[in-house]
């Protein structure tokens, strides 16, 4: 599956879920499903990053392995699409450039950028955040048990009307204590990742001896 895959045109929006997915886990899947249920979107577009400007060391697994894991995790699931555009750019993954690409692909579809509250807290460090806000709606994940997202960081970047729309696009989901870094540590120390990642993904990780200490 790649960016060349087409989806039916409609007036529904498109959810954008970017990340390293190193590895993809059930928390990511729950985020996407919650977005599908709560936002006016037709599908969630998973966009694995090459190298994040805020994570300059880059992913641990190769691009191909991360794509393989995503394909296995999303196989047969409706409303979930993989877009490898950022990987094919062979450069740092800036959200603004990805949004410009998606606007060219889907000029009449509103874009919803799905981010966590932690990403919102550092939004002022993103490249040209004001331009990002002109090209998409932010949809912030609010996890039960966590402090509510702090939208004050957006003050001065856009007007109050858009900030209110962003608040209304907030996605509710339970708190899930799973992270890719914890999973990599569990694998490196010989602990189980069962039920934390889809079974086919766990099988691939084991077969390819990924994330093991060398």
UniProtKB/Swiss-Prot annotation:
One of its GO terms (molecular function) is nicotinamide-nucleotide adenylyltransferase activity. Its EC number is 2.7.7.18. It comes from the Bacteria. The keyword Transferase applies. It catalyses: nicotinate beta-D-ribonucleotide + ATP + H(+) = deamido-NAD(+) + diphosphate. Transmembrane segments: none annotated. Pathway: Cofactor biosynthesis; NAD(+) biosynthesis; deamido-NAD(+) from nicotinate D-ribonucleotide: step 1/1. GO terms for biological process: NAD biosynthetic process. InterPro entries: Cyt_trans-like, NadD/NMNAT, Rossmann-like_a/b/a_fold. It holds the Pfam family CTP_transf_like. Catalyzes the reversible adenylation of nicotinate mononucleotide (NaMN) to nicotinic acid adenine dinucleotide (NaAD). This is Probable nicotinate-nucleotide adenylyltransferase. It comes from Rhodopirellula baltica (strain DSM 10527 / NCIMB 13988 / SH1). The lineage of its organism: Bacteria, Pseudomonadati, Planctomycetota, Planctomycetia, Pirellulales. The gene is nadD.
